């Protein structure tokens, strides 16, 4: 029987492998730095968030093993803007090829466009209670924290260029330095071609010429100048920059997405062979895809952001999504919120009630998953919970005094004992989901003449004085018009819920309100 490592999750397995590797390398394990790179050029999405959340999870497992850890959240805000993300102001077009830290924030709330984008991701991490040490590329380069690594890399640029061509077939760095200078005259970086490294003065000579950036031709200004590698006048290319950071920040773990696998392979080689620094332990994860199977992109409009998700779901639902597994591509949309919310509810019930399906290993893994979804913060007991899908359906019915009326139904159903702040919070989230996701025009309903006649009679009945036996009355109306009661009930559910079935129709109409239902029916006649 295979021994359970830690809490039985992939997170624990990775942390265990990391420590074993560090011991084999003879390095101290008193403090382990894990890193996540934050893109600063596009709108941060759930995939961007997942990189940092997973790294933090590995850190938590390290802490569980008795090792101190720190998550370094590194914003690549010296990167240049290659294209304007969908939905962003077109005025950003004039800043194409400029470092995102040098572009004004179009919304005026941060010191730069890059910091605005990074701030959105940090806001998501804060909402999840993820602790991190935030660092900016602009400050890192400006303060010369990578200068020794840059010197070592540029001094070996010919060797690196040959290796890049050998490993991934990219010829570019055989003839140019793996360094992007920022033109001192026009402020653009991808037009400033680095042509020579002067090791004695530690400066990069460049000339600013026309270049293709983000699929478009961008004009250079013709300026020739020098960039000091000890400042923020340029940055290393991705193919080598990770290695510089890993050594400068003593990074021992970094996960990466499948899309940058080649860059990581090259950086591992640069770290090991050029900088003589053993590369970090890695974990490769698959990307989140949109519901059409396309990669979620920072610059396109198919982005599910942490902010959008948290309008409908709890932080625990996001953490569960990230910690369930690390392998396998997954399609992700806001329509997945209900399933994750209910899955967390199931884990909570199993955790405190005991039992569960799948044997001891599966039970241990599920317990561990619940604990990581709460960032290993011990839970005193189960929080009040109700099935999210039920909350959504009830929220669709009750807009006025929603929390009170939905809670009343939950008590009647025996789901909860009474009102509580937690249930009110869940109703608020489910209510947002109901209001936003079902706001589109409802589907058409085909009604024959007999059904229309029965519905008209029901409208008259609902407008009269309330009486007992509404369920039987509806049944009788259907029969009197020659409509099978089952078909009549289905038509009513379609009108009220836009679904083919629902709760017992008579009490259901009384719950919603006779006048309101009558109005719904009139709108379909």
Swiss-Prot record:
GO terms for cellular component: cytoplasm. Pfam families: tRNA-synt_1f. Keywords: Aminoacyl-tRNA synthetase, ATP-binding, Cytoplasm, Ligase, Nucleotide-binding, Protein biosynthesis. Its EC number is 6.1.1.6. It is found in: Cytoplasm. It catalyses: tRNA(Lys) + L-lysine + ATP = L-lysyl-tRNA(Lys) + AMP + diphosphate. Coiled coil: none annotated. GO terms for molecular function: ATP binding; lysine-tRNA ligase activity; tRNA binding. A motif ('HIGH' region) lies at residues 40-48. One of its GO terms (biological process) is lysyl-tRNA aminoacylation. Belongs to the class-I aminoacyl-tRNA synthetase family. This is Lysine--tRNA ligase. The lineage of its organism: Archaea, Nitrososphaerota, Candidatus Cenarchaeales, Candidatus Cenarchaeaceae, Candidatus Cenarchaeum.
